[in-house]
Amino acid sequence: MTPVKVFGPAQSTNVARVLLCLEEVGAEYEVVNVDFTVMEHKSPEHLKRNPFGQIPAFQDGDLYLFESRAIGKYILRKYKTREADLLREGNLREAAMVDVWTEVETHQYNSAISPIVYECIINPAMRGIPTNQKVVDESAEKLKKVLEVYEARLSQSTYLAGDFVSFADLNHFPYTFYFMGTPYASLFDSYPHVKAWWERLMARPSVKKLAAVMAPQGA
C-alpha cells in the first residue's frame, strides 16, 4: 500500500496534529517538506493541494484534503481498530463528548494558548518580532479561565471525553507542547488534574515520538 503523504514540516503545530493521528493508528506515511522561504506554500502546485496556501495538505491516492482536524478525522476513520478507536463513533454518547471537547479545543483552548506561543516563541525566534506583552497577558488570563473548566472536567474523568483517550485530547498536544517551553508553563501547576492529564498524554509513544521531532535542536 502506498503511504499517505503529509505536506508541511513536522514542527508545524497543524502538521504535527495530523502526524500524531497517523502515529496513533500505525499508518505508513511520508512527510513532504514545504519550503516557506521560497514561498512554496503559495506555488500553483501546492495551491492544488490546499487552495488557501497553508499547511498541512494531505494526499491519499487521488484524494487531497486540507484542514488538520478534518484530516485527523479521516485518518482515524480509515484506520480505526478496536485498539485505535479515537472518535468513538460506535457509541453515540461517547462520540458526542468527543465532538464537544474537540470544539472546545478549537474555539476556547486554542484561541487562548496559541497567542502565547506565537508571542513568546514564533514571533521573536522566527520572525524577528518582539513579544507583545499585552497580548500575552490577556491570553494568559483567558487561558486560566479555560483551565478552570478543564480542571473541573478532569476531576470527574481521566480524559476530556470520558475515561478513554480520544481525538479531543490529542488535538491539544501541539500547542501545549510548545507552550511548555514558554515562561508561562507553570500555569498548569495550579490545575493538578489538568497537569496529570497532560503528563498522561506525554507518556504516550506517539506523543513521545512527535515531541522528539518538534523539540528545538540542542534541547
From Swiss-Prot:
Tissue note: Constitutively expressed in roots.
An annotated Gene Ontology molecular function: glutathione transferase activity
Record keywords: Transferase
Top-level lineage group: Eukaryota
Gene3D superfamilies named among the record's database cross-references: 1.20.1050.10, Glutaredoxin
Domain GST N-terminal: 2-83
Catalysis: reaction(s): RX + glutathione = an S-substituted glutathione + a halide anion + H(+)
Pfam families according to UniProt: GST_C, GST_N
Gene Ontology cellular component annotations, sorted alphabetically: cytoplasm
InterPro entries according to UniProt: Glutathione-S-Trfase_C-like, Glutathione-S-Trfase_C_sf, Glutathione_S-Trfase, Glutathione_S-Trfase_N, GST_C, GST_Phi_C, Thioredoxin-like_sf
Residues holding glutathione: S12, H41, K42, Q54, I55, E67, S68
Broad EC category: transferase
GO biological process: glutathione metabolic process; response to toxic substance
Its EC number(s): 2.5.1.18
Occurrences of domain GST C-terminal (ranges): 91-219
Stated induction or repression of this protein's expression: By the herbicide safener fenclorim.
Transferase is among the record's keywords: yes
Known function: Conjugation of reduced glutathione to a wide number of exogenous and endogenous hydrophobic electrophiles.
Family of the protein in this entry: Belongs to the GST superfamily. Phi family.
Name of the protein in question: Probable glutathione S-transferase GSTF1
